[in-house]
């Protein structure tokens, strides 16, 4: 028999429900359902027990149209996400409903979004490098397969573009499965991402649909269901216009889908999965909104007192087990570019590699605007990467650090006061800085340049040639937005020829 209650109070997304008639309270984190007058189902999540018969819940949808006295049904379980091969290539919201205009996937399997982290004995500790084809990342802050990676940056420095390039590169290089959780970001970016994935073949809607899309149409009747099951990605969205409840839970919905692919279904081996979260700060921000609405005392800078607990509960689920792995890339918005803010600082503690995007580097026109001295990785050591890679990375860091120290002298006294050796360091460091830039596949329509994936061997060779002084004769501009060092040499020699009057 259903456990039925009634709404007693509505304050924005917070709804109080009384179960006085049934006398049975739903468990904490249970999903409750209310049906509006127009037939739409609103899902609530039980957060607090207020007394003998009352609970306080947070809504996963907007609450317009709800009134006191409406019937509320306890589902008896947490919010469920459909899983299985049928969710490949599909778009879902926080409660696992398809939002791509196609029918709900035919899968009997569902998993609760609140699940325990894997047991200690099941966790895998093997270390393997995940090469991305992006020079600055692969050389100085390499990613760990099955690790957690953070992309830190303020507004408008290129976090989402970098994430889209990583999805594109890794899907093509490793033919991996990706789950993308859009947490509190722009709806337009979600739309762009879906189109980008269809164009690149990461999501496969079939040839007929692709042709209609190229002609400017969006005819979902032309989607090939067989082709859809061969897609390499699943998308889950809770955008910035949605309720704080949805934004606080959508990352867990995406993670649940990734966990299913990682663990397998019991009959077959699990997979290596990529989980992209854009933006993990919005998860914290939504948690802060919910916490305040629930009446909890705020802690530092107004964040929720349970910030570290909520972050830890989610991050501990993102791990590699003996059956498969989840490698997560998380974009982290840094409020006012302050890395000591509690939200990014709490995220730092869980990461294996950090890629810091800098406004100062973006202002130089160097994209991706990765700060090579602020970014780090726990596997930057010779045992994992080998001596040649490690030594090259150290040489690059040393020359950039020395250049940074000399910048104050240059600003006050000018280049004339530097020693001959320091002048060489400055010019080589500037070439190194520019060689970190690279044209992206996903930015081809903005830059007009063909996207490049660069192997680690080509990257090491290029930076060694610059630091050894083999390319001192080439202009600095030759190293800007190129892939391999051969392209830089070709571009530089062409520039020199054009500069010499015939």
From Swiss-Prot:
It is found in: Cell membrane. It catalyses: ATP + H2O + 4 H(+)(in) = ADP + phosphate + 5 H(+)(out). ATP binds at residues 153-160. It comes from Amoebophilus asiaticus (strain 5a2). Its EC number is 7.1.2.2. One of its GO terms (cellular component) is plasma membrane. Disulfide bonds: none annotated. GO terms for molecular function: ATP binding; ATP hydrolysis activity; proton-transporting ATP synthase activity, rotational mechanism. Its main location: membrane. Produces ATP from ADP in the presence of a proton gradient across the membrane. The catalytic sites are hosted primarily by the beta subunits. Keywords: ATP synthesis, ATP-binding, Cell membrane, CF(1), Hydrogen ion transport, Ion transport, Membrane, Nucleotide-binding, Translocase, Transport. This is ATP synthase subunit beta. Coiled coil: none annotated. It is a peripheral membrane protein. HAMAP family: ATP_synth_beta_bact (MF_01347). The gene is atpD. The keyword Ribonucleoprotein does not apply. It comes from the Bacteria. F-type ATPases have 2 components, CF(1) - the catalytic core - and CF(0) - the membrane proton channel. CF(1) has five subunits: alpha(3), beta(3), gamma(1), delta(1), epsilon(1). CF(0) has three main subunits: a(1), b(2) and c(9-12). The alpha and beta chains form an alternating ring which encloses part of the gamma chain. CF(1) is attached to CF(0) by a central stalk formed by the gamma and epsilon chains, while a peripheral stalk is formed by the delta and b chains.
